[in-house]
């Protein structure tokens, strides 16, 4: 474990009316499959709702939901996200799957103003907190998608389109009977590898060592990815996460595994 509480897993041959707005996750209409997120209810404040109403039409998208306007999202290959039009510039794009309340998302975007970040989260409350922080801090290089990360990868991005994919502290689903719900499975990692451009980075972090071993095994088994060290120089995106509540746990003695791969082949 490093001075920052990071643990490197050795390469293996193994493993979202005012205060009562609902936060039910969107229905996964695209893929009738086991999902990695849990059902959850929460609310957003009046102030957050006001910010949402003002900014979401410009800065947010929804994969699909029973309440989504018809035609809001064209999911044909020709209708994938036009990130240059959305951000208003040509820049490398990083996709963060499961941004939570956006603490890392905001800080890393502020540190890399030349990188465009698309943050995906199922739960509206987390996106509302991030949207309010973006507004307060004047951060312009983040866009938000509410929905399932696998649906986003499948329908909204094409091959070789991403400079980075970040998956920080995904639900470990620790019980053996729930392991099938884990986000980072072979099929998902293969999809990520397809969407990364050559030289692009997959960066995963977890404080659950059982899941870390699983992620290591799955990532190392993907032939288009090569394990790299988080401190390697010359990477196209930063791998320095801010000190979040998860990092504070690490400094208190809970190890955090940082796992990175580079896409080496098309």
Swiss-Prot record:
Domain of life of the organism encoding this protein: Bacteria
Binding locations of S-adenosyl-L-methionine: 96, 121, 148, 171
Enzyme class, spelled out: transferase
Pfam families assigned: Methyltransf_4
InterPro entries the UniProt entry points to: SAM-dependent_MTases_sf, tRNA_(Gua-N-7)_MeTrfase_Trmb, tRNA_methyltr_TrmB_bact
Gene3D superfamilies per record: Vaccinia Virus protein VP39 (3.40.50.150)
Sequence positions that bind substrate: 175, 207
Annotated GO CC locations: tRNA methyltransferase complex
Keyword annotations of the record: Methyltransferase, S-adenosyl-L-methionine, Transferase, tRNA processing
EC number: 2.1.1.33
Active-site feature positions: 171
Substrates-to-products reaction catalysed: guanosine(46) in tRNA + S-adenosyl-L-methionine = N(7)-methylguanosine(46) in tRNA + S-adenosyl-L-homocysteine
UniProt-listed CDD domains: AdoMet_MTases
Pathway(s) annotated for this protein in UniProt: tRNA modification; N(7)-methylguanine-tRNA biosynthesis
MF terms in GO: tRNA (guanine(46)-N7)-methyltransferase activity
Region (Disordered): 1-32
PROSITE patterns: SAM_MT_TRMB (PS51625)
Covalent S-S links between cysteines: none
Family per record: Belongs to the class I-like SAM-binding methyltransferase superfamily. TrmB family.
Role played: Catalyzes the formation of N(7)-methylguanine at position 46 (m7G46) in tRNA.
Name of this protein: tRNA (guanine-N(7)-)-methyltransferase
């Amino acid at each position: 474990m490093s001075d920052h509480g990071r643990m490197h897993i050795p390469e293996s041959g193994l493993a979202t009316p005012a205060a009562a707005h609902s936060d039910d996750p969107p229905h996964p209409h695209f893929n009738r499959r086991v999902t990695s997120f849990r059902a959850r209810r929460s609310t957003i404040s009046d102030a957050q709702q006001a910010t949402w109403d003002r900014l979401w039409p410009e800065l947010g998208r929804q994969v699909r939901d029973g309440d989504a306007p018809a035609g809001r999202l064209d999911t044909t290959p020709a209708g994938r996200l036009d990130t240059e039009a959305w951000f208003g510039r040509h820049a490398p794009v990083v996709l963060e799957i499961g941004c939570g309340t956006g603490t890392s998302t905001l800080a890393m975007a502020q540190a890399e103003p030349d990188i465009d970040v698309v943050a995906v989260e199922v739960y509206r409350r987390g996106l509302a907190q991030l949207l309010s922080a973006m507004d307060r801090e004047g951060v312009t290089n983040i866009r938000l998608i509410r929905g399932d990360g696998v649906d986003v990868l499948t329908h909204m991005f094409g091959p070789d389109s991403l400079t980075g994919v970040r998956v920080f502290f995904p639900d470990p689903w620790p019980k053996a009977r729930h392991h099938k719900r884990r986000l980072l499975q072979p099929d998902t990692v293969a999809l990520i590898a397809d969407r990364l451009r050559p030289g692009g980075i997959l960066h995963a972090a977890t404080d659950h060592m059982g899941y870390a071993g699983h992620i290591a095994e799955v990532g190392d088994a993907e032939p288009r990815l090569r394990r790299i060290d988080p401190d390697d120089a010359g990477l196209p995106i930063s791998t320095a996460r801010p000190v979040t509540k998860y990092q504070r746990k690490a400094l208190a003695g809970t190890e955090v595994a940082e796992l990175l791969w580079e896409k080496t082949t098309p």
